[in-house]
């Protein structure tokens, strides 16, 4: 089959060819109304302009106003038939042999914007955010550090996707500075706890699923139908203050050590775009209980990378590489488990995967693991470092390598700035 091509010039190394078309929300000017968009090459396609021109002419979307909203929530709520229709329409009107947009100079000028000149914002209203703990390698490494080899992974971990409820209000878009959090820490021994800026600030390499239609209160989602409730994935950095977290987490789990900031990438890559990169998820032993047993257990071959640009330096260092395949619990199992007690999910809710660590030290997904809680400093082109310092910039990237094209997520970037005096 010939590779689908667009009339938009897209470089071979671009994350955003016509095979991808990820969704986001942008503002052409800082004071303009937000509008939904898809990315293609170096351009942003304004979906409100496409909608107003009547180009969404399918049965579901022809009279819909979902792309005239300032966020994606209404579109997310419409479900997979609408998502598939939108994708089909967009691929058709952007294809190289379709004149309806290609040859309409007025509409092209109205619809396309240079990505480098627009402001991207959080693309949906996030009512709730839950963070899972789905990588076995990450769970094992944390257990080895804090509990020892005898109890590295708690028995319940292999039985259910562990999670905690995060703070939706502090989720920010890529490029937003992160203020070093303040809180209580506790030194070794019997010393009194201290209060002040975190001394062990860390990143966590994660991805997150964006919830689509969701479910009514009291009506769980079957694990084999869960994919129809996941619109797509994005990159996520769940910034973590390890010293605050270690002192506070017993007995109820993370609080101030996590709630100060979570960064997401601006573009949501749909499950339809990821479908060619689906792969078998790890075999689960013991077998999951029936409500978590999937007919097909799918992960995705998404290569992930973290770059650290130390404060005052012009160069960045690649400090780890991992892959979405390293998740033990699938995103569909995570969603099904979340709802099995009757909990209702809503359009735009965010489900984080937890840190995606691989089996080898160069694939660990956070500094806690990479430096083994500060005991093994990281080498950075002639200098060493344990945790994040003020001025450090962390950038995630993720991409699927296709045959002649990429399906990528762009980047997820944040810089650490000092705590206020």
Curated annotation (Swiss-Prot):
NCBIfam families: fum_ac_acetase. It comes from Arabidopsis thaliana (Mouse-ear cress). Mg(2+) binds at residues 238, 258, 262. The gene is FAH. Its cofactor is Ca(2+); Mg(2+). It comes from the Eukaryota. One of its GO terms (molecular function) is fumarylacetoacetase activity. Ca(2+) binds at residues 131, 204, 206, 238. InterPro entries: Fumarylacetoacetase, Fumarylacetoacetase-like_C, Fumarylacetoacetase_C_sf, Fumarylacetoacetase_N, Fumarylacetoacetase_N_sf. GO terms for cellular component: cytosol; extracellular region. Its EC number is 3.7.1.2. GO terms for biological process: cell death; homogentisate catabolic process; L-phenylalanine catabolic process; tyrosine catabolic process. Belongs to the FAH family. It catalyses: 4-fumarylacetoacetate + H2O = acetoacetate + fumarate + H(+). The active site is at residue 138. Disulfide bonds: none annotated. Disruption phenotype: Spontaneous cell death phenotype under short-day conditions. It is an enzyme of class 3 (hydrolase). Keywords: Calcium, Hydrolase, Magnesium, Metal-binding, Phenylalanine catabolism, Tyrosine catabolism. Converts fumarylacetoacetate to acetoacetate and fumarate. Involved in tyrosine catabolic pathway. Catalyzes the final step in the tyrosine degradation pathway. Substrate binds at residues 147, 245, 249, 355. Pathway: Amino-acid degradation; L-phenylalanine degradation; acetoacetate and fumarate from L-phenylalanine: step 6/6. This is Fumarylacetoacetase.
């Amino acid at each position: 089959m010939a590779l689908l091509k667009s009339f938009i010039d897209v470089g071979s190394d671009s994350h955003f060819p016509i095979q991808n078309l990820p969704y986001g929300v942008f503002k052409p000017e800082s004071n303009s109304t937000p509008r939904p968009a898809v990315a293609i090459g170096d351009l942003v396609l304004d979906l409100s302009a496409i909608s107003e021109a009547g180009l969404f002419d399918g049965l579901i979307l022809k009279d819909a106003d979902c792309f005239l909203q300032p966020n994606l929530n209404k579109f997310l709520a419409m479900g997979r038939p609408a998502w598939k229709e939108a994708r089909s329409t967009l691929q058709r009107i952007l294809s190289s042999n379709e004149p309806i947009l290609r040859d309409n100079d007025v509409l092209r000028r109205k619809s396309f914007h240079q990505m480098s000149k627009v402001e991207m914002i959080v693309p949906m209203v996030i009512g709730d955010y839950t963070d899972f703990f789905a990588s076995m390698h990450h769970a094992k490494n944390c257990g080895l550090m804090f509990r020892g080899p005898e109890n590295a992974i708690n028995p319940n971990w292999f039985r259910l996707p562990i999670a905690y409820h995060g703070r939706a209000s502090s989720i920010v878009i890529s490029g937003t500075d992160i203020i070093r959090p303040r809180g209580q820490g506790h030194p070794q021994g019997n010393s009194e706890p201290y209060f002040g800026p975190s001394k062990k600030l860390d990143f966590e390499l994660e991805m997150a699923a964006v919830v689509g239609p969701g479910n009514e209160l009291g009506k769980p989602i079957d694990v084999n139908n869960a994919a129809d409730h996941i619109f797509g994935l994005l990159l996520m950095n769940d910034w973590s203050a390890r010293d605050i977290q270690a002192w506070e987490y017993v007995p109820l789990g993370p609080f101030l050590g996590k709630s100060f900031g979570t960064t997401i990438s601006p573009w949501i890559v749909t499950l339809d775009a990821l479908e060619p990169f689906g792969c078998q998820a790890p075999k689960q032993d013991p077998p999951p209980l029936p409500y978590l047993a999937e007919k097909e257990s799918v992960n995705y071959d998404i290569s992930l990378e973290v770059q650290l640009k130390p404060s005052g330096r012009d160069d960045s260092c690649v400090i780890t590489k991992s892959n979405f395949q390293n998740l033990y619990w699938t995103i569909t199992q995570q969603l099904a488990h979340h709802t099995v007690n009757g909990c209702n999910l809503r359009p735009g809710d965010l489900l984080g995967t937890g840190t995606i660590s691989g089996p080898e030290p160069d694939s660990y997904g956070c500094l806690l693991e990479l430096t083994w809680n500060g005991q093994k400093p990281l080498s950075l082109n002639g200098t060493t470092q344990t945790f994040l310092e003020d001025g450090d910039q962390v950038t995630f990237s993720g991409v699927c390598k296709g045959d002649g094209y990429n399906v990528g997520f762009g980047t997820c970037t944040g810089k650490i700035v000092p705590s206020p005096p």
